[in-house]
Amino acid sequence: MNYITAAIAFFYLSKKILQPKTRVVHNLKKLFTAFGLALISWVCTLATVLIVAAFVSVIGRSLSWYTHFYVSVFLYGTAAAAKLILVHTLAKKLLYKNMNEQYPGDIFFDASLMIWTVALAVITHLGLCSAFICAFWVAFPLLTKLMIHKEFSQKGATMKFVMMYMLGMFVPYLYTMYLSWTVFEMFTPIMGRSGSEIPPDAVLAGLIVVTTIILSSYFINFIYLVKSTKTTLITLAAMFVVTLILVCSGIFFPYSSDEANPKPKRVFLQHVSRRFHDLDGNVVKSDSGIWINGFDYNGISHITPHVPEINDTIRTPCEEQAPFCGLPWILPVHFMFRKNWYLPAPEIVPRNPIHFKVLSKELTPRNSLRLSFEVSGPSHMSLYVRPHEGSALSTWSLGDGTPVASVGGDYFVFYSHGLQASPWHFWVELTAPEKHSHGVVSLAIAAHYFFGEDQKSPQLYALLERLPNWTFSSGWSCTYDLFVF
């Protein structure tokens, strides 16, 4: 059905281009000019809206729409619509000023139909089930065009033409708006925990631009049919400017503790004690503190007024020689959360400490070094492995035996067991150069105390109590030990 729909649309477009045969080249030129203008308008719109999103992010007003979604529509939606209309208004005045208004209106409809038909054919060929959405955007507009062609060619853009046109577009527009709303319902909460490196305003602005382009694809031709777009442009520009001023003023607070519609800021706090050992097993560095992850692009900027000691002066330094920056991650998402904070705190002494033992070091027939370990501790532990320069982790006793590196080249394993379990035994095998005076691998183990009497220290509990009610916090204690072999 998709191929049949695309074939009918291509037949319609071919017939339009070939009438009359003496103007085939001229008709093709006009069609591809309209196609090029559509692409230019999309690029200009995306660039403009992303610049606005970057500005909002730089001034520290990111996620202003997190609780008030309508803000994103008035900020980015109006900017996108205004830019699209402006580009085509300029094209109308510069390229089509001496033409009958019906001609550019007709040619831009055909350009939109061609874009959707090509998309339908390509997506169907790729075997993607979502091709039926493109089929909607080909079949319904084409049927509508055929039904109102006589009315349009004889009388122009009458009220009857507009009403029939809108009615014909009702099904694809309604379904696309439903899908768009579903996408925004999914992505808006995700932006609240997308990390410190991805500007959420840029992501949402991009989604709004794509939605605007799709929904306006068959209405661009109306810009060439109406006498003036001045009133529309002024209205959209005024709405955008007012919204931008309000966003810059900080009137739209990102988070909410409303029980009916909660939009909390997620915060993870881990009271951690760290010990770094050298090649001889001696502790060369140790510290203790509460490690804080803000989870979104705003970091801790909104928390600082409530808890002044949590500020940018305590940004966590990265331990370059340690895997995952020497921090007890529970998931390998360090590349998404490069900005985190480390508040000095007393050392924790768990009642059920971790025990890490080297069982053996042996050379294999393949000239590899195999290290065997025994670990006992709480029910949840993380293992971090970083081969040194010149070394490589070839195999291990975990999973299917094939190590898979995380982003950055380090290896991560999350291990958990029941309340009563025997010690965890595993081995790693590394290929290494003959001379390795500084060791061949750095291996770290973290113990996470998610429950029980070791879960929260008094300092951690006190800090959690001071967080504002619009935060959703998770806190636990953990230890981190780094070894070099």
Where are these regions (language model features)?
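Alpha-helical transmembrane segments of integral membrane proteins
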Residues: N2-P332
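Extracytosolic and intramembrane catalytic regions of membrane-associated proteins
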Residues: V272-F485
